Amino acid sequence: MKIGITPSIKEIYKNQFEYCVDIRLIDFLKYCFINPKIFIVNESSLNIKNINFLIISGGNDIYDLVKHKKNFLRNQLDNKALNSAIQKKIPVLGICYGAQFISHFFNNKVFKKRGHVQKINKIIIKDKSYLNKNFIKVKCFHNYVIKAHKKLNEIGFCEDKTIEFYKIKNKKIYGMMWHPERDYNFKNFNKMILKRICS
């Protein structure tokens, strides 16, 4: 399995930007797949034709919602990577910000809502073909949420009816609003979800 990850972008000093990938995400992917080859996707390595799976990782905010240069740079990178993955029909998973970015990319509403940061949320599983459970509990870290839309297939949703896990209709593009890599002990249901997405 060859996996590309788009990194978060942080401003470490005035106009000095750092590209970052959480080491826990890399460890989580090693937990899910046997000897994965992991590539960090940036402007100089945007050719993603040799990967089997693209992850738009967490971190940052959508530039249209939070006007900051680091978000502008991130959104530019993710736009190019997602367009390339769509063209080459590579499966994509957006994690947290990545899920919001994909939703926004397909013109679905993303809006600010309290109660989803550092909180354990109960996610009701609507589509059991992805996970044969009625619900799961996950820790969330996001300020923005996603509303239901005709372009999304809801797979799992929160008790406040906001979407936590979805698939773009007619495409192998998914969004997951929680961070599977942030559990101290990786959860097997997250591994099952990734395997299902890549199958």
Spell out what each predicted region is.
Residues 140-144:
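DNA-recognition element of transcription regulators
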